[in-house]
């Protein structure tokens, strides 16, 4: 499944695509778990294991695609009025994606363990030593040499067949792919961790701005209070001056009136 970059820069469509992928990842994880439960039962078959591998790889690709979509969503331009709502939406998508990835990685690890157990059983039944064969040609040459020098020996438990080798190499290839996919998911978790960290920085910045705003408000209130006090004192002083002037005028008027009479 290939990644289709963007949806015309429309945040609503991009958010819908992300939500849809998250739902698919969750559903695929459930299906992978159901398939894992069938391994080692009468329903187990090479076809079932192939379906398991394909489903796992498809889900892994969905996870990579969703990671890119979320990054794109976070980089979309936004107006100040939309910023808060956009951040809430992104936080929700990141949280849902993290939950779905956690469940997916859990079944990934289970699948890898099942494959390793299968290889171990085949090796044990075929008397194959070592963990992972580095050179399959050596084992094939060994089988050929044993078949030529001991054609009469037909003890199945002590021989490794071509089918055994094929199964071992297929399963080991599957294990390596699973481990690589698990590492891919780990990288996505790191990306999500960085997003959460950046969101924390934004929150810290917002809180700092709020605190600064509160300080400025307090300072402004103090300045207003001082201004009000000054204004009250000014009015009081003005009233006293006016009163003195009135009294002075009255005294002068009385003196003038007395002189005239």
Swiss-Prot record:
Residues 47-69 form a coiled coil. The modification Phosphothreonine is found at residues 4, 79. Disulfide bonds: none annotated. It comes from the Eukaryota. Its main location: membrane. GO terms for molecular function: chloride channel inhibitor activity; SNAP receptor activity; SNARE binding; syntaxin binding. Residues 2-238 are cytoplasmic. May be involved in protein trafficking from the plasma membrane to the early endosome (EE) as well as in homotypic fusion of endocytic organelles. Mediates the endocytic trafficking from early endosomes to late endosomes and lysosomes. Belongs to the syntaxin family. This is Syntaxin-7.
């Amino acid at each position: 499944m290939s990644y289709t970059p963007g949806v015309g820069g429309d945040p609503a469509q991009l958010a819908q695509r992300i939500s849809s992928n998250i739902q698919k990842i969750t559903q695929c994880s459930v299906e992978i778990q159901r398939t894992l439960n069938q391994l080692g039962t009468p329903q187990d078959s090479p076809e079932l294991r192939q379906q398991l591998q394909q489903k796992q790889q498809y889900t892994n690709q969905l996870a990579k695609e969703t990671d890119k979509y979320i990054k794109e969503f976070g980089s979309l331009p936004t107006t100040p009025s939309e910023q808060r709502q956009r951040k809430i939406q992104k936080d929700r998508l990141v949280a849902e994606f993290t939950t779905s990835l956690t469940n997916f990685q859990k079944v990934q690890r289970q699948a890898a363990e099942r494959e390793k157990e299968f290889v171990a059983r085949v090796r044990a039944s075929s008397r194959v030593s070592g963990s992972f064969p580095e050179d399959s040609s050596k084992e094939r040459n060994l089988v050929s040499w044993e078949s030529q020098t001991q054609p009469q020996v037909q003890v199945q438990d002590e021989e490794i067949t071509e089918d055994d080798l094929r199964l071992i190499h297929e399963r080991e290839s599957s294990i390596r792919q699973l481990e690589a996919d698990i590492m891919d998911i780990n990288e996505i978790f790191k990306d999500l961790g960085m997003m959460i960290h950046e969101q924390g920085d934004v929150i810290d910045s917002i809180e700092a701005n709020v605190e600064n705003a509160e300080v400025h408000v307090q300072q402004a209130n103090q300045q207003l209070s001082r201004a009000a006090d000054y204004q009250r004192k000014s009015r009081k002083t003005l009233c006293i001056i006016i009163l003195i002037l009135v009294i002075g005028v009255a005294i002068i008027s009385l003196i003038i009136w007395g002189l005239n009479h």
